[in-house]
Amino acid sequence: MDIEYELIETYGVFDETESGWTREVNLISWNGREPKIDVRTWSPDHSKSAKIGTLSKDAARKLGQILVRITE
């Protein structure tokens, strides 16, 4: 089963790996459903993604700043 997604808006990137994958906060519609705030790691071309398991303190701080900004 293919999973379809539409990236509606990028709120911010809060971390990047040496291989170029980025940890991002986005507004995404999955399989045509209502868009939701989504936090995950993306490949440079956004063709692959992975859920986030752990964060450094610096990445957590940046994530917190993005979440505060988009919910104000």
Which sequence ranges carry the predicted segments?
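Positively charged, low-complexity terminal tracts
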Residues: 1-72
